[in-house]
Regions:
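HhH-family (HhH-GPD) DNA N-glycosylase catalytic core used in base-excision repair
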Residues: 1-298
Length: 298
């Protein structure tokens, strides 16, 4: 076993509870375990099981990677930590943009320092988007757990590790459809995994950070549509300008914000969100948050 260590400074107003809540959604904790002051997450990286262990202090994240093997994994693991801690997108530029906005300024005041917490990798974000689309959250979490247990591997500590494309590509469709996955979801997951594993589809962004070519390549995969691509850009790549106009919750939040009787359609939502470019990801984050009940003072 190899151990790597980092101490990552946290910005003022960092919302650790949001990060812990995001990674603690699966009550059975097969691949993520959380406490009030930290988290552990299992991932496969270059075929090697790794557990990322994070302990929060008031101004830093004390991080350790427990690696079941060898390999030069320090740089990609540091990147995965930035992802799962929500440190990719700085919320301040959007907060400054929204400060004079009569609609969004109140949302930002209610949730100062709100961040986008990401999946550990683009592949995890894409597969989670496919798994969770058009079903309720508890069922989606259950299917995600099944997916991890079918395709992932256990770390020496016992924690399961989220699979990579190669692990998923080995599955047969019946491995998923016999466990409550629809055939369409199962086919899309295996299709994506096999394209990535064989090298036909790369999930690496170009050095320029241009997401247009990546978006088009993903849209060419049968079963992947604009919503899945935008969600992957947000949760997988930390792209700051995702337009989530196809998201039902975003449209519901906009309906509430505008005080209208019906949800705006996708075209109108897309047009409305354009005014917040190049910070539409954070606009979406605050719209999502506006649907949550206010925290109790007691």
């Amino acid at each position: 076993m190899t151990l790597l260590h980092w101490t990552l400074p946290l910005p003022a107003g960092y919302r650790r509870d949001d990060v812990i809540a995001f990674h603690g959604r699966d009550g059975e904790a097969v691949a993520e375990q959380v406490t009030p002051t930290g988290l552990r997450k299992g991932i496969l990286l270059a075929g090697v099981p790794v557990v990322l262990d994070v302990a929060f202090t008031p101004d830093a994240a004390i991080c350790q990677a427990d690696i079941d093997g060898d390999g030069d994994l320090e740089a990609p693991l540091h990147g995965a930590l930035l992802n799962i801690l929500g440190l990719r997108i700085d919320p301040q530029p959007f907060a400054q943009l929204a400060a004079g906005d009569p609609l969004l300024a109140p949302l930002v005041r209610v949730n100062p320092g709100l961040r986008i917490v990401q999946s550990a990798s683009p592949f995890e974000a894409l597969t989670w988007a496919i798994i969770g689309q058009q079903i309720n959250l508890p069922f989606a979490i259950s299917l995600r757990r099944t997916f991890i247990l079918q395709a992932g591997r256990q770390h020496g500590s016992g924690l399961w590790c989220y699979p990579e494309a190669r692990d998923v590509a080995r599955l047969e469709i019946e491995d998923l459809t016999s466990r409550k996955f629809s055939r369409a979801k199962a086919e899309t997951l295996l299709r994506l995994a096999r394209l990535v594993d064989e090298g036909t589809l790369s999930l690496e962004l170009p050095a320029s950070g241009d997401v247009a070519a990546m978006s088009q390549a993903l849209l060419a995969v049968k079963g992947i549509g604009p919503w899945t691509v935008n969600y992957a850009l947000l949760r997988g790549y930390g792209y700051a300008d995702c337009s989530l106009h196809g998201d039902v919750a975003i449209r519901a939040a906009l309906q509430k914000l505008l005080g209208e009787e019906a949800k705006p359609d996708m075209a109108r939502t897309e047009q409305w969100l354009r005014q917040y470019a190049p910070h539409r990801t954070m606009a979406a984050a605050h719209l999502w948050a506006s649907l949550q009940p206010p925290a109790s003072d007691g």
